[in-house]
Amino acid sequence: MASLQRKGLQARILTSEEEEKLKRDQTLVSDFKQQKLEQEAQKNWDLFYKRNSTNFFKDRHWTTREFEELRSCREFEDQKLTMLEAGCGVGNCLFPLLEEDPNIFAYACDFSPRAIEYVKQNPLYDTERCKVFQCDLTKDDLLDHVPPESVDVVMLIFVLSAVHPDKMHLVLQNIYKVLKPGKSVLFRDYGLYDHAMLRFKASSKLGENFYVRQDGTRSYFFTDDFLAQLFMDTGYEEVVNEYVFRETVNKKEGLCVPRVFLQSKFLKPPKNPSPVVLGLDPKS
């Protein structure tokens, strides 16, 4: 297996067969079933972690390589960095970062209570280095666990796609409150026409670019325009917002799997300093 990666500002171009498949698969899941999926979202993710334990996702050692922000946001090399991983799963991103960088303190939360238990059972879990808690980012206030405007960087990695599109802005509003002015959200998630999107069977579609898996968990596939609008409507500024195209090639079987992700960086605007009025005595 080999992987070839490139970045771009335009969505992937479909083959004629892929276009035909998407045109055929237009039937939406019933409103009743959609409401049931929303009500049972936490239960379905908890069952996912019960089935897969900590074995489903690989540890993400690419994070610091892909997101230079984790290094560049420091003024000096051993400066302490406070981060929030919103949607940490079982710690596949969290623990490699803590292991690689001794000067990181991390807040980490997840929708699934079972995932949080797996994080706390990890041998690398250290309460001096991280605070981990269960949280539904669409309704639980992060300020109950994280001081306001105390976080240097927020990691939002393959998380927002699992949230209903109507509630995504609530997640962004929530993390906005704990992020320092002038600091960033680092985002990576599924992009439009990713291989996973094209593999969904008929009757899996919930809405535009939104699908349900057989286990009841859901996935949204982002366009750069949709994501940019979502962040900017919540008060962030766009810094980087680009597609990552990755082809996984299996020469032995003659397969080429096109993966598409969106990798982005959005900034919470810095606070404007108080205007200085010339010619006035500040004591008067």
Swiss-Prot record:
Changing residue 85 to Q: Strongly decreased affinity for S-adenosyl-L-methionine. One of its GO terms (cellular component) is nucleus. CDD domains: AdoMet_MTases (cd02440). S-adenosyl-L-methionine binds at residues 45, 49, 87, 110, 136-137, 157. GO terms for molecular function: enzyme binding; tRNA (cytidine-3-)-methyltransferase activity. Disulfide bonds: none annotated. InterPro entries: Methyltransf_12, METTL2/6/8-like, SAM-dependent_MTases_sf. S-adenosyl-L-homocysteine binds at residues 49, 61, 85, 87, 110, 136-137, 157. Monomer. Interacts with SARS1/SerRS; interaction is mediated via tRNA(Ser) and is required for N(3)-methylcytidine methylation. This is tRNA N(3)-cytidine methyltransferase METTL6.
